[in-house]
Regions:
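Internal alpha-helical scaffold of NAD(P)-dependent oxidoreductase catalytic cores
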Residues: 1-68
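NAD(P)-dependent Rossmann-like dehydrogenase/reductase catalytic/cofactor-binding core
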Residues: 50-143
Length: 143
């Protein structure tokens, strides 16, 4: 089997780009309990993706993409991985620790350190924290 690979001269930038895309896609798949591709069909999700992309591009230095480019790349990944279930959703569904601390919480820490306001990411963290806590408490509904 032939392996298709490409040498990356700026690996740090590629890591930051993957981080940025994962900060958008992964938590949304948990919140909406869906595969990646379904994010394109959920009302309001486009708006959240745009807001997160703006916040990330203002917070993560040397990402190499404008917020518009990050939106485009995120949508490309959503399309290319349409039938995939994000690792965060898989972990959440299996009652395992998610990588939220390494993604959106880390983004929040960088923003705080640099006095950058990222309200959409803060809302995402709050929603995920509530979902995870309710799951840990064995509560599946809000009654």
């Amino acid at each position: 089997t032939e392996i298709n690979w490409q040498w990356q001269h700026n690996i740090e930038q590629k890591i930051k780009q993957k981080f940025a895309i994962n900060c958008i896609i992964n938590p949304l798949t948990v919140i909406y309990n869906c595969q990646n591709g379904s994010l394109k069909n959920i009302a309001g999700c486009k708006y959240i993706i745009e807001k997160l992309a703006n916040e990330i591009s203002n917070t993560v230095s040397d990402i190499g993409w404008s917020s518009e480019e990050l939106i485009t790349e995120t949508n490309n990944v959503i399309t290319l991985t349409a039938t995939n279930k994000s690792s965060m959703l898989t972990d959440y569904q299996n009652n395992k620790a998610t990588e939220i601390e390494f993604l959106n919480k880390q983004l929040s820490n960088v923003a705080k350190k640099n006095n950058i306001d990222i309200p959409t990411n803060s809302a995402i963290l709050c929603l995920l924290s509530t979902l995870i806590q309710r799951q840990n408490d064995g509560q599946n509904n809000y009654n």
